[in-house]
A protein has these predicted regions:
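Short acidic low-complexity segments
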Residues: 28-38
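Pocket-forming structural segment of enzyme catalytic cores
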Residues: 92-172
Length: 212
């Protein structure tokens, strides 16, 4: 059984993530700082809201340093969800003041850009169910059928990766949308697995059994 630290930095809704972890048969601990992370086998970084606000709260609580120690040094598996995935990037143009982009955690070589679908009838945010295309094999998608790769999205920005090898899955919404990224012991999903019914639970279960 995995012991999962779910990071609550003040603007994310952790209840549905906790419910999903427990539904998969694992122990979930919600933490606001370093407590709980040291004893955890896996870490989940959820997120909703604005990139700049989230990064400020993370830095104010010292969570950037906690993640560096736990993920980069100790090698604990990290799943970052929605805004959490975007926070893995180096920068984001969301609400950039005078063209100065917000700095992210820098765990993935990527930048976050606003969705600009070519079809003017497609509304922003991208909200609802969408299928993803698997670009490469990864344990997060182990034993998942191509016909069971529909997930629930709610976002206006998306990650643009410098290294295409970091992209595991991609969706289409008038443009290519990075849906899953992975590097070493880090995985990010732009969609919400905890809101994606059977496919989301299967993906979450894969993460909780993953020991990179």
């Amino acid at each position: 059984m995995a012991r999962v630290a779910i990071i609550d930095y003040g603007i994310n809704n952790v209840r549905s993530v906790r419910n999903a972890v427990e539904y998969c048969g694992h122990e979930a601990v919600v933490t606001h700082g370093n407590e709980g992370i040291a004893d955890a086998s896996h870490i989940i970084l959820p997120g909703v809201g604005a990139f700049g606000d989230a990064m400020k709260k993370i830095r104010d609580r010292g969570l950037d340093e906690v993640l560096a120690r736990s993920v980069c040094e100790a090698g604990k598996p990290l799943l970052a969800v929605c805004l959490g995935m975007q926070l893995l990037a180096k920068t984001s143009e969301e609400h950039a003041d005078g063209g100065v982009f917000f700095q992210g955690l820098g765990l993935i070589e990527a930048d976050v850009r606003r969705l600009r679908p070519k079809d003017p009838d497609l509304k922003i945010p991208h909200m609802g169910w969408n299928n993803i295309t698997k670009l490469r094999e990864h344990p997060i998608l182990a034993n998942m059928r191509e016909t069971n790769l529909a997930f629930y999205f709610v976002h206006s920005f998306a990650m643009s990766c410098e290294n295409e090898d970091d992209v595991v899955g991609r969706a289409t919404y008038g443009q290519d949308v990075t849906a899953i990224v992975a590097r070493d012991n880090i995985v990010g999903t732009q969609f919400h697995p905890e809101k994606s019914q059977d496919s989301g639970i299967e993906l979450m279960s894969n993460f909780l059994q993953w020991n990179p």
